[in-house]
Amino acid sequence: MEKFVELKKVTDRMFQEKKIEQHPLFVALNNGEFSEEQRKEMALQIYHVVLYFPRFLSAILTNMSDYRMRMPLVENLFEEHGKMNEKYVHSETYKEFLKGIGVSEKEIMESEPSIPVIAYNRGLTDLCLHYHYLEGLAALGVIEEIVARVSPLVGQIAKSNYGSENKSLIHFTDHEVLDVQHANEIYEVVALNYEGDQKQMIERGLQFGMYYHSRMYTDILENVH
């Protein structure tokens, strides 16, 4: 518990300094600076990240030899897959959100990930698969926390712009709660090894998570302008 508290102080400080909720993408969205087509394109690009996220978890699990440390991640992966209910698979709930803001099934099917999103997906896969699991795991913890922090903002903006009913916003209402839980579960696993030389590796992983995800938001913003 002591190491977890110490690690949480590091992540809390990081989020105080970076203030991801004030990223220019969310400021511009909140200020209504985008056309409907631009909003839809940004939402579609995030879809390609949501679609890919379970593969990051799968990649990192291959590098973890201790089943006890794998268990929280397996549960996370189980929830990503809707606890085996296809209706609640996270990529499917996100598709419901897309439809709620006026994106058609045809537009979803024809959408392609942009170069920034491909770079993000490949970069994180590489980190999770080919480097020490503590580094990748720390990055995923930060990413889960970022999503938990921005989900209420996105949900509120969607309600304001589209009057979306709660049903189509389930992806974001779920992630407000689930991703806080997932982030803390990941931090708890990482904290078990937060000592000695591994501290530096873990802190580098935290920074990677913040860098990759905030950079992805920046690149998506630049792409639609």
Go through each PLM region and give its residues.
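Non-heme di-metal
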Residues: 1-225
